[in-house]
């Protein structure tokens, strides 16, 4: 099972919150104290809470569940994309489009358009167009890929969303809440933990912290998927034995 230790978190700077004047009082239970005007997060809480979240994600993946990684602020976007791809899951790393979950029917049409344009770009259709038309379609393709590339193969709503930066991604969290989709989120001292099923109190700005979270979630999803594949192989073997 994937777990993260106190040492891992200390080395990654997970315990450094925001300046005390920007705090959200709802995060008080998770704050150890303050140092040089910066809140220090109590890792005695964060370690077990994150490991519980990892176990949940692993369990979702073990049942062929879909994990959607969400992190659109600059510090998080690259790690979000890399980690989601590494475990063959899904991601939103550019901008959360309103209705991405709650208006899935419309999003699905945009994904279909994206896939059509991808086909046209490789089957020679673009070559038959005027330069201007080809350029317009190329731009449309790039725009759709940027917004929807990480979810184009999701094939339906996710079973859990994993969020870096609860404040920044409040629309995604609200949409998941409306649909009853569980939310795992890293929540810094300036953010609200409301609407989050698995709260991970921690630094949501430092690259090292963000990579620790995203890589751990990817490892948990991989481990869960491995269990699923092992069970499948066992069942397949059982059928062959008959």
Curated annotation (Swiss-Prot):
Key word Ribonucleoprotein present: yes
Source organism, top-level taxon: Bacteria
Keyword line: Ribonucleoprotein, Ribosomal protein
Alphabetized GO MF terms: structural constituent of ribosome
A cellular component annotation (GO) from this entry: cytosolic small ribosomal subunit
Keyword Ribosomal protein attached: yes
BP GO terms, sorted: translation
InterPro entries: Ribosomal_uS2, Ribosomal_uS2_bac/mit/plastid, Ribosomal_uS2_CS, Ribosomal_uS2_flav_dom_sf
CDD domains recorded: RPS2 (cd01425)
HAMAP family to which the protein is assigned, alphabetical: Ribosomal_uS2_B
Protein family membership: Belongs to the universal ribosomal protein uS2 family.
Matching NCBIfam families: rpsB_bact
Name of the protein described by the UniProt record: Small ribosomal subunit protein uS2
Species of provenance: Shewanella sediminis (strain HAW-EB3)
Lineage, broadest ranks: Bacteria, Pseudomonadati, Pseudomonadota, Gammaproteobacteria, Alteromonadales
Gene name of the record: rpsB
């Amino acid at each position: 099972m994937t777990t993260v230790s106190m040492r891992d978190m200390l080395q990654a700077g997970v315990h450094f919150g925001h300046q005390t004047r920007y705090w959200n009082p709802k995060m008080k239970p998770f704050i150890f104290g303050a140092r040089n005007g910066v809140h220090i997060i109590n890792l005695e809480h964060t370690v077990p809470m994150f490991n519980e979240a990892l176990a949940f994600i692993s369990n979702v993946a073990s049942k062929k569940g879909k994990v959607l990684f969400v992190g659109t602020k600059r510090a998080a976007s690259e790690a979000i994309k890399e980690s989601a791809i590494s475990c063959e899951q899904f991601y939103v790393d550019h901008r959360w489009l309103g209705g991405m979950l709650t208006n899935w029917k419309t999003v699905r049409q945009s994904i279909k358009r994206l896939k059509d344009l991808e086909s046209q770009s490789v089957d020679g259709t673009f070559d038959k167009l005027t330069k201007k038309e080809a350029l317009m379609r190329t731009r449309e393709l790039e725009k759709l890929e940027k917004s929807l590339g990480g979810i184009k193969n999701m094939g339906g709503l996710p079973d859990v969303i994993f969020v870096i930066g609860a404040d920044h991604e409040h629309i995604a969290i609200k949409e998941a809440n409306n649909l009853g989709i569980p939310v795992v989120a890293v929540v810094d001292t300036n953010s609200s933990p409301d609407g989050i099923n698995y709260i991970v109190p921690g630094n949501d700005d430092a690259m090292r912290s963000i990579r620790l979270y995203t890589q751990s979630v990817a490892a948990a999803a991989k481990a869960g998927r491995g269990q699923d594949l092992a069970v499948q192989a066992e069942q397949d073997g059982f059928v062959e034995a008959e």
